[in-house]
Amino acid sequence: MSLFHLILVALIQGITEFLPVSSSGHLILLPALTGLEDQGQVIDVAVHVGTLGAVVLYFWRDVRDGLAGLPRALTGRLDTPGARLAMGLIVATIPTVLAGAALHFTGLSDALRSITVIGWTMLLFGLLLWWADRTGAQVKEATDWSLRDALILGLWQAVALIPGTSRSGITITGARAMGYTRSDGARISMLMSIPTIIASGVLLGADVAVTSDAQAARDGAIAAAFAFVSALLALSLMMRLLRSVSFTPYVIYRLALGLVLLGIAYS
């Protein structure tokens, strides 16, 4: 795998992981449209580690509070904001873990990796994001996040296992439909990504430890570094823009890319 290809994969993952445009969809499209080889599990795990580091650093106060409240959450004592956050993230992650394991072990995840599927999901879920952002009230904040809302958003998040859906896009859509502000809906979505990325990395990396070599480890370190920097920049820019800009630019991008992909798929 060339250095150019390595950096390209890392940048695509880093930039698109937290934007509502589907990182997995873009990574599937890269070899399909360019003829480049698939990056493999080592690089997949590495870029996940990089993006995980970015979101943890950006939301480090929330992460600190959640970790501090985790012991209380595990014993059912939801009497602090940190404990409620930790329990909310646990509840929100369960549907995705169960659905992801089912798709992985049945082989259905591979069947969904096609340009046609990505094209349709880009279009359909882009329109759904536009509808939710246009019609959803902005009356709820992150402090209003309940276990009921966590479960609902967890079910939305499980849908993102279909390539092209976008994990951040579908959870932000759900949050906006439930009346969360753009900034707080995105904040909840980003925090939900942390246990999800960890679970995904564990699943992808099950065999990496015994199959990787020194070269693979070096490639992984490079990929993780570039993914970390690009993800942190993209996340910072998006959260800043959401103070004054809607999700319409991302919707337009999704619709344009979806139409191009369907044109390729059906030509």
UniProtKB/Swiss-Prot annotation:
Transmembrane segments: 1-21, 40-60, 85-105, 111-131, 190-210, 219-239, 245-265
Domain of life: Bacteria
Top-level EC class: hydrolase
An example Gene Ontology biological process: peptidoglycan biosynthetic process
Family annotation (InterPro entries): UppP
Subcellular location: Cell inner membrane
Reaction catalysed by this enzyme: di-trans,octa-cis-undecaprenyl diphosphate + H2O = di-trans,octa-cis-undecaprenyl phosphate + phosphate + H(+)
Principal subcellular localization: membrane
This protein's UniProt keywords: Antibiotic resistance, Cell inner membrane, Cell membrane, Cell shape, Cell wall biogenesis/degradation, Hydrolase, Membrane, Peptidoglycan synthesis, Transmembrane, Transmembrane helix
Topological type in the membrane: Multi-pass membrane protein
GO CC terms: plasma membrane
The keyword Transmembrane helix belongs to this UniProt entry's keyword annotation: yes
Pfam families linked: BacA (PF02673)
GO molecular function, a single term: undecaprenyl-diphosphatase activity
Function of the protein: Catalyzes the dephosphorylation of undecaprenyl diphosphate (UPP). Confers resistance to bacitracin.
NCBIfam families: PRK00281.2-4
Family to which the UniProt record says this protein belongs: Belongs to the UppP family.
Note: Bacitracin is thought to be involved in the inhibition of peptidoglycan synthesis by sequestering undecaprenyl diphosphate, thereby reducing the pool of lipid carrier available.
UniProt-recorded name of the protein: Undecaprenyl-diphosphatase
Gene that encodes the chain: uppP
